[in-house]
Amino acid sequence: MTLSADKKQPIIDKFKLHENDTGSPEVQVAILTERINLLTEHLKTHRKDFHSRRGLLKMVGQRRALLNYLRDRAPDRYRKLIQELGLRK
């Protein structure tokens, strides 16, 4: 499940750090979160789609690694990001 450009651009605009930013950890985590949410909805109706489930697990692992990187390098940006995305309680 991929995001179309028109859905991806508002996410990039919201989380970018500077004008041409598309690859900062914040942007990557936000895009992965949206993809994870879409795939989770897909898997609720297609329970036996194990290939997509594997892709979901890979995306969750990738997001976890990016969040760990951000937590170690910039804890204040990490806390702000998880609050905006609602990833923690």
From Swiss-Prot:
Q: Which Pfam families does the UniProt record give?
A: Ribosomal_S15
Task: Cite the entry's keywords alphabetically.
Answer: Ribonucleoprotein, Ribosomal protein, RNA-binding, rRNA-binding
What InterPro entries does this protein's entry cite? Ribosomal_uS15, Ribosomal_uS15_bac-type, uS15_NS1_RNA-bd_sf
Function text? One of the primary rRNA binding proteins, it binds directly to 16S rRNA where it helps nucleate assembly of the platform of the 30S subunit by binding and bridging several RNA helices of the 16S rRNA. Forms an intersubunit bridge (bridge B4) with the 23S rRNA of the 50S subunit in the ribosome.
The record ties this protein, via HAMAP family, to: Ribosomal_uS15_B
Similarity comment text for this entry: Belongs to the universal ribosomal protein uS15 family.
Question: Could you give the subunit structure recorded for this chain?
Answer: Part of the 30S ribosomal subunit. Forms a bridge to the 50S subunit in the 70S ribosome, contacting the 23S rRNA.
List, alphabetically, the NCBIfam families matched. S15_bact
Listed name of the protein? Small ribosomal subunit protein uS15
Origin species: Desulforudis audaxviator (strain MP104C)
Q: What taxonomic ancestry is recorded? A: Bacteria, Bacillati, Bacillota, Clostridia, Thermoanaerobacterales
What gene name is given for the protein in this entry? rpsO
